[in-house]
Amino acid sequence: MPVRILAISGSLRAASSNTAVVEAVAALAPADVEIDVYAGLADLPPFNPDDDREPLNPSVADLRVRVLNADALFISSPEYAHGVSGVLKNALDWLVGGEGEIVGKPVALVNAAPRATHAQASLAETLRTMSSRDSGGLDHDRSGRP
């Protein structure tokens, strides 16, 4: 049975380097790894706890099912104002109110920019609060070297 990884780019930008990382991971995955590239961040409504009930918005339901069906998550996030993008945080907020889809799930975090350390730390803290398992990230210096 293949390992299923849900890969998410935290950017909506057309020429996003984080989306390029996610697409490269999908293209280079070994045969025993299935990469499900999630491209629905723009479709998610703004998080509102009052709307976190049945019937769920179809985009929210789709995100939750895809996280539930994944063995692990791979998130590549840009950094905006020393934090993660609003659309990525919005998606994570929708997972807080779910049925624990992300609890205990391994999550790998990467940033395509070498100076995105604040977003990495912010995202790691959010995911710890959500009880996911931090699978570590790739630390590198300003030149991109580990």
Over which residues does each language-model region extend?
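N-terminal beta-loop-helix "entrance" segment that forms/cooperates
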Residues: 40-57
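N-terminal beta1-alpha1 ligand-phosphate binding loop
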Residues: 2-30
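N-terminal glycine-rich anion-binding loop in soluble enzyme alpha/beta folds
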Residues: 26-45
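Helix-loop-strand module that forms the ligand-binding subsite of alpha/beta enzymes
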Residues: 55-130
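Glycine-rich phosphate/pyrophosphate-binding loop and the adjoining helix
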Residues: 1-6, 133-146
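Residues at the starts of beta-strands that form the adenosine-phosphate
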Residues: 4, 34, 106
